[in-house]
């Protein structure tokens, strides 16, 4: 294992009956990074987290933690803690008692417990809430207590299984920022599970996109969004226009009946490929100036932009623009070479 990896999954396979949940999955997780396992329901992300935590056992493969194989180590002996969507707080205990619970089990001195609990309350911005009943707290406050209870034990890794799922949108966005702040302040590894693309893009150092028990792509939020590895990733991470094309040469691609300059290279000449264009990368221009031309068939106001649908003879293009367009009007679309992303064509993802 490389020195900067804290966890390494090697060829993890897991099945329930005839259903393969994880298919020979391998993954390296670095020290001090915020890594997100992202994918739709049933993709295997939560099972991966549970195998790391020790709540599930892999059928085959190894879980390596700091150079030691931990497949047979029970959860309570692993140097990591888990926060679930259902926070599992003790309703008969107040905030202080919930956070102190694990420390009391370890029979730590009272003054040490008091110091550590106060440090956690400050970290999660709940100073002054020590004596509050759990049921008197909001969902966001309860979640902070759950995070403090997990972190007070000083784990080397914190596992978070869709912990924001029960919160409303405003609270969720606030907690995204809070979680990232806490992770950066503590400098420990966070492994976060979600199906929410915005959450993953907002918080992560590294995103692992999963589907059908396999890793589709792993990289920074910028790489995942701007350079999707395949059509599944392109469709799952934000909205995309995806069309068939032909790579004529390095930096030269043909699609939608015309030739465009692009920034991709390394494909075979005349190789069949797929072209990805993000809706926000289209520029709306006069009809006669357009690289692509069509008729506006739909305009939906989304708050920060209009979602505009433009149809030509063979394609329907979706673009996001702050300018309004009239339904039935003919407009042109312009593209920079950097906005045209090329993917290898796959028959089935």
Swiss-Prot record:
Binding site for ATP: 39-46
InterPro entries: AAA+_ATPase, ABC_SmlMolc_Importer, ABC_transporter-like_ATP-bd, ABC_transporter-like_CS, Mo/tungstate-bd_C_term_dom, NA-bd_OB-fold, P-loop_NTPase, PotA-like
Listed EC numbers: 7.6.2.11
Name of a matching Pfam family: ABC_tran
Domain ABC transporter intervals: 7-237
Keywords: ATP-binding, Cell membrane, Membrane, Nucleotide-binding, Translocase, Transport
Entry membrane topology: Peripheral membrane protein
Gene Ontology CC entries for this record: ATP-binding cassette (ABC) transporter complex
Domain of life: Bacteria
Reaction catalysis annotation: ATP + H2O + polyamine-[polyamine-binding protein]Side 1 = ADP + phosphate + polyamineSide 2 + [polyamine-binding protein]Side 1
Family assignment from sequence similarity: Belongs to the ABC transporter superfamily. Spermidine/putrescine importer (TC 3.A.1.11.1) family.
Role, per record: Part of the ABC transporter complex PotABCD involved in spermidine/putrescine import. Responsible for energy coupling to the transport system.
Name the UniProt record assigns to this protein: Spermidine/putrescine import ATP-binding protein PotA
Organism field: Clostridium perfringens (strain 13 / Type A)
Taxonomic path: Bacteria, Bacillati, Bacillota, Clostridia, Eubacteriales
């Amino acid at each position: 294992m490389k020195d900067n990896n804290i966890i390494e999954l090697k060829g993890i396979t897991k099945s329930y009956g005839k259903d393969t949940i994880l298919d020979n999955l391998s993954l390296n997780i670095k020290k001090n990074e915020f890594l997100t396992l992202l994918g739709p329901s049933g993709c295997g992300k939560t099972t991966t987290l549970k195998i790391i935590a020790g709540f599930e056992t892999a059928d085959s493969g190894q879980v390596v933690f700091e150079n030691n194989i931990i497949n047979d180590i029970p959860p309570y002996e692993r140097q990591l803690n888990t926060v679930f969507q259902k926070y599992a707080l003790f309703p008969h205990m107040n905030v202080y008692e919930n956070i102190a619970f694990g420390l009391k089990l370890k029979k730590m001195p009272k003054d040490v417990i008091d110091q550590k609990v106060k440090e956690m309350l400050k970290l999660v911005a709940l100073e002054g809430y020590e004596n509050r009943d759990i049921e008197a707290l909001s969902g966001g406050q309860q979640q902070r207590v759950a995070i403090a209870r997990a972190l007070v034990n000083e784990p080397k890794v914190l596992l978070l299984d869709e912990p924001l799922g029960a919160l409303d949108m405003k609270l969720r966005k606030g907690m995204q920022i809070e979680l990232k702040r806490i992770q950066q302040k503590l400098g420990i590894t966070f492994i976060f599970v979600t199906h929410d693309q915005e959450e993953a893009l907002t918080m992560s150092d590294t995103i692992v996109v999963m589907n059908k028990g396999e890793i589709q792509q792993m990289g920074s939020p910028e790489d995942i969004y701007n350079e999707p590895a395949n059509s599944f990733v392109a469709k799952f991470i934000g909205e995309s226009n995806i069309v068939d094309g032909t790579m004529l040469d390095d930096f030269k691609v043909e699609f939608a009946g015309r030739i465009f300059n692009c920034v991709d290279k390394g494909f075979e000449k005349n190789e069949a490929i797929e072209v990805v264009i993000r809706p926000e990368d289209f520029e709306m221009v006069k009809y006669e100036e357009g690289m692509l031309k069509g008729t506006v068939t739909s305009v939906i106001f989304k708050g920060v932009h209009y979602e505009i649908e433009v149809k030509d003879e063979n394609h329907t293009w979706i673009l996001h623009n702050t300018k309004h367009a009239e339904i039935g009007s003919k407009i042109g679309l312009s593209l920079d070479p950097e906005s045209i992303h090329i993917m290898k064509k796959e028959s089935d993802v």
